[in-house]
Amino acid sequence: MSKVKGFIYKPLMVMLALLLVVVSPAGAGAAHSDASSDITLKVAIYPYVPDPARFQAAVLDQWQRQEPGVKLEFTDWDSYSADPPDDLDVFVLDSIFLSHFVDAGYLLPFGSQDIDQAEDVLPFALQGAKRNGEVYGLPQILCTNLLFYRKGDLKIGQVDNIYELYKKIGTSHSEQIPPPQNKGLLINMAGGTTKASMYLEALIDVTGQYTEYDLLPPLDPLNDKVIRGLRLLINMAGEKPSQYVPEDGDAYVRASWFAQGSGRAFIGYSESMMRMGDYAEQVRFKPISSSAGQDIPLFYSDVVSVNSKTAHPELAKKLANVMASADTVEQALRPQADGQYPQYLLPARHQVYEALMQDYPIYSELAQIVNKPSNRVFRLGPEVRTWLKDAKQVLPEALGLTDVSSLAS
């Protein structure tokens, strides 16, 4: 927070007194306040979280504590659908688009002096926000696929990769929605971007080589081992359940099913536990590899970036820091009303884990997962939009899906 420096007034002469009135911090502050009152920053939070309203409320609350005279206008935008419009000052983007956004000139870099408490950010997350050696986004939240299983299921608890999981679960012969009790795998492989991202994640596991995919791989031919592994996941889930999208678009419906007894195991993000409610205490989770070899843990990283076209770069960078701060993220993740649960998203700052684990022990386990030295941010190259568009057409057929209509982005 900014501090206003005062000074001691001594009545030496009238002229000096008048001069002090003109240049006093109070006068300067008033002028700054008047100027700021005419400024509105346009901002977009990351929409694909269990409770976006908590994030918006936290950002607004923390911002008003620092810059009460600068208004915020929240707008709907996401990096999957479009490049940032010129009038969008600050926004949260998925780092799979970071290289594209940087190379296209959409983002301002952050110098070391522009990042508040950089030492608190998970090192791999900050490294994953760089392009050509410069930071172009402040890490806010992370996502990674986890294998969820019930505490008493010791055999699933011994699984480390999808091939071992298949040996325990086998092929599901049910197309039932919701799936049968304690049978099969619950997993969402419906979207076109989901399939494409899973292919590239698995390719890193299969090759054993981490890459930011500056050069994206060819779609002809596809990697046979990766396709076989993805098909195993579909077989464990059943084709229809794996491609199912509810009419209301509920991204966490499978977590609800799992809490109600469906499926023997569930692969999803940590934030799915918010939907499980109290049942989350009966569940264990762990990372799972797409390869029988060494696992390279990959994390999606949502970063707060500043538009290169903003008319207020200093204020915009200040807002970006507020949005990515430990105070804002902790407030957004905590329950804000009776009957609510933590969002169980993965924050990108150590302080948030330390605070949340005091009240929610699950965050102690999540902290262990994000602090592994082998963790990397999942990044895609500057041609990401073209590659994804092409992959959405190729992958459903390659995966042997009979209903290829589910090409949602």
UniProtKB/Swiss-Prot annotation:
Enzyme type, top EC level: transferase
Catalytic activity: pyridine + thiamine = heteropyrithiamine + 5-(2-hydroxyethyl)-4-methylthiazole
EC numbers for this chain: 2.5.1.2
Location(s), subcellular: Secreted
Active-site residues, Swiss-Prot/TrEMBL: C143 (nucleophile), E271 (proton acceptor)
Entry's induction text: Inhibited by organomercurials and iodoacetate.
Primary location group: secreted
Signal peptide from the UniProt entry: 1-29
GO terms classed as biological process: thiamine catabolic process
UniProt entry tagged with the keyword Transferase: yes
Domain of life: Bacteria
CDD domains reported in the protein's UniProt record: PBP2_Thiaminase_I
GO cellular component: extracellular region
Gene Ontology molecular functions: thiamine pyridinylase activity
Keywords: Secreted, Signal, Thiamine catabolism, Transferase
Disulfide bonds: none
InterPro entries tied to this protein: Thiaminase-1_dom (IPR054393), Thiaminase_BcmE (IPR030901)
Subunit structure comment from the entry: Monomer.
Record's function text: Degrades thiamine by replacing its thiazole moiety with a wide range of nucleophiles.
Name of the featured protein: Thiaminase-1
Annotated organism of origin: Paenibacillus thiaminolyticus (Bacillus thiaminolyticus)
